[in-house]
Amino acid sequence: SSMALAALEHPNIKIKSGLVITKRNHLEVGLEKYTKTIKCLESDHPTPSLTSLECGADLIKFINSKQPDDEFLFLLSGGGSSLVENIVEGFSLEELMNLTDALLSRGYNINDINAIRKHFSQIKGGKLAGFLKNRKTTVLTISDVPFDDPKVIASGPLSHDDAKINLDNYEDDITDKIKSIRPISCPDISMFSNINTKIIAKLDDAKFACKSHGEKLNYETYLNENFIEGDVNSLANYFSEYLENCQKGLHIWGGESSVNLPEKPGRGGRNQQLALLMAEKIRNKDIVFLSAGTDGTDGPTNDAGGIVDGNTINKGNECKLDYKKFIKNADSGNYHEKTNSLVTTGPTGTNVMDLILAIKK
C-alpha cells in the first residue's frame, strides 16, 4: 500500500481509479485521502482465505470494467501470492489452505511454493495477462525472491511462464494433489507484448543501505554476496563457523531461511528461530546477531525477528527459561520477548526478504 500512496502522490502519474490489496493492518496512512479514486481491501497472509478469493474476484472485475484504450499500472510486491487468488475449478479453498500450510511448515523454498500456487490458480503464472487483452500495462515490482525473478514475485501474475512443475521436488501427498488437477495454460507470449515490467527495489538495495550506515558509524563493513537460504539449523552452523573465523566489524547478509515446524508450533518465525539458535552459538562471546524481515513481520507474527548477543542465553537462564525447549517447540518469539531480544518495528511498507547482521567486536 505504500507503493500505491507513492504513485498517487507522484506529480507525473495520473490515476483515474485504482484497487489496493494489502495485508490486514498494513494500509498506509494517507491512503484515506484518496477514497474517491481508489478502493482499499485488506486480505490474509501467509495462508490464503475466503477474503483472498474475494479480492481475486474484485481484481478481475476491476480489470474487466475498464475501456479498451485504458492503460494499467500494477504495483507488485511480496505477499501477493496469498492476498489475491482465483483458483481453478475442482480445487476448494479448504484444499488450498491446507496445501499452503503444508508447504510453509515443511520448509519448502519460495520457488517451489509459488510453482504450486501457479498450478492451482487462474491468475498466477502469467494468467492474469489474459484479462488485460493487450492493453498497455506497466508493472513496477519490489522483489522479495531470490535473484529477483518476476516470474516468482507474487507468483508472477503478469510474467509469461510455461514452465512445468518438477514433481521430484515434492513429497508424495503433494505430488498426488498436483496430478489430480489439470492446470490452465499460460496465455500465448503475444498477450505480453504490451506489458513492461521493471524492478524498482530489491534485497541488494537494503544490504547496501546497511553497509553505508555501518560505515557512517565507523564499522569495518563486510558485505556478503551469497544468498542465504535453507533450514535455520544448518544456517546457524554456517554463521557460527563464519563468525568464529572472520574479522571484527559489521557483517551483512540477505536472503530467506526456512523452518520445519512441529505439529503445534508456538510463537515465532524463521528469523526469530534463527536468532535463538545463534544465541546458543555465540553465548559468552562479544558478538551481536540480528535476523529480521524487512517488512516488519516474521512468519504469522507481528514481530520482525530477533537480536541476540553473548548474554542472551544467560538472561534466559536467570528467568529459568530452557532455550532448548523453546527451539524444539518453535516458540522462539516468547523466549525473545522474555529476554528482551525481540525485534518489533511494525509494518515497514517494504518487503525485500530478510536481513542478517552480525557485529563482531
For the regions a protein language model found, what residue spans apply to each?
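Active-site cofactor/substrate anionic-group-binding motifs, chiefly glycine-
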Residues: 3-32, 42
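Short beta-strand segments
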Residues: 19-22, 74-78, 139-145, 154, ...
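Active-site catalytic microenvironments in core metabolic enzymes, especially phosphate/sugar-handling
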Residues: 21-25, 227-229, 257-303
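Glycine-rich oxoanion-binding loops at beta->alpha junctions
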Residues: 23-68, 116
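Proline/glycine-rich low-complexity loops and linkers
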Residues: 42-51, 104-132, 298-326
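Accessory alpha-helical/coil subdomains and C-terminal extensions
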Residues: 132-138, 154, 159-235
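Internal helix-turn-beta structural module
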Residues: 276-361
